């Protein structure tokens, strides 16, 4: 991880420091925020969240927008949608610096992120960056509903049953990974399937699994879309927040 500036180094973070609380605010429907997360959000003086793309509000910001009061300070943080390690580490460093500026003054910060904190969450990187330099910093976590659970709810099916094995692939860089998952698990979930949909569709056609496969776009949001039985949809144009559920017989 990239080095932090002197401001962040060597701090013992004594009792005057604020508390960092991560809030999983669910997959998109504001009513799916847990009671505990909503309580923490409404009591917060400083609310941080990932900044959206190209100046547009991000998903977490949109989820909590109607819950925020005018007196609450909002702190958008930049987490770029890239794979380059140096760019990501630099972004985590800068986000940690911004949050630390608040915490070191004794103010608490809540960080809202879509889904659940433990499921491919940006909060993990922020918390790790701060904890590495401030081991006595109090960090709390409030779990939320992640997108696969919202997706299967929309489809009206269980995610798993009895002894079903489950594989979740956050991104697909090789079709061999999907082949291996389908050989092993009864249920496979593909996140961010938008960029590889044609290749995945062809693989599922070869394995005769299209009828048991579905796509949910923007699960639980007002503009949610459901595509069941993918044999009917060989050429879908999907947005970023799209996931696929595949059930092997």
What is the meaning of each model-derived region?
Residues 2-30, 35-37, 42-138, 223-228, ...:
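Class I S-adenosyl-L-methionine
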Residues 12-17, 39-40, 103, 111, ...:
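Solvent-exposed alpha-helices and their adjacent loops that cap or buttress functional pockets
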Residues 20, 182-249:
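A contiguous loop/helix-start segment that scaffolds small-molecule binding in enzyme catalytic cores
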Residues 24-25, 111-114, 143, 170, ...:
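Small/polar loops that bind or transfer phosphate-bearing groups
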Residues 27-28, 52-55, 79-80, 164-173, ...:
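Short, acidic/turn-prone active-site loops that include or flank metal/cofactor-
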Residues 75, 140-142, 214:
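General small-molecule cofactor/ligand-binding pocket signal
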Residues 94-102, 158-170, 232-243:
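A polyampholytic, Gly/Pro-enriched intrinsically disordered region
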Residues 115, 119-184, 235:
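Class I SAM-dependent methyltransferase SAM-binding "motif I" and its flanking Rossmann-like core
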């Amino acid at each position: 991880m990239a080095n932090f500036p002197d401001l962040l180094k060597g701090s013992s973070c004594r009792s005057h420091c604020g508390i960092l609380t991560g809030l999983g605010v669910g997959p998109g429907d504001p009513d799916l925020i847990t009671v505990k997360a909503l309580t923490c959000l409404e009591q917060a003086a400083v609310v941080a969240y990932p900044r959206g793309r190209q100046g547009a509000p991000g998903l977490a910001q949109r989820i909590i927008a109607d819950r925020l009061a005018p007196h609450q300070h909002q702190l958008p943080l930049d987490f770029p949608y890239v794979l380059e390690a140096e760019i990501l580490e630099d972004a985590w460093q800068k986000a940690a610096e911004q949050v630390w500026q608040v915490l070191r003054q004794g103010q608490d910060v809540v960080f809202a992120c879509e889904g659940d904190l433990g499921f491919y969450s940006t909060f993990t990187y922020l918390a790790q960056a701060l904890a590495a330099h401030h081991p006595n910093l109090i960090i709390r976590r409030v779990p939320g509903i992640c997108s696969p659970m919202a997706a299967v709810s929309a489809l009206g099916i269980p995610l798993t049953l009895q002894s079903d094995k489950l594989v979740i692939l956050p991104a697909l860089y090789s079709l061999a990974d999907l082949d291996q998952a389908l050989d092993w698990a009864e249920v496979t979930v593909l996140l961010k399937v938008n960029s590889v949909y044609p290749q995945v569709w062809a693989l599922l056609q070869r394995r005769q699994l299209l009828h048991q496969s579905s796509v949910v776009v923007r699960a639980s949001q007002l503009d949610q879309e459901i595509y069941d039985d993918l044999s009917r949809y060989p050429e879908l144009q999907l947005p970023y927040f799209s996931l696929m559920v595949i059930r092997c017989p």
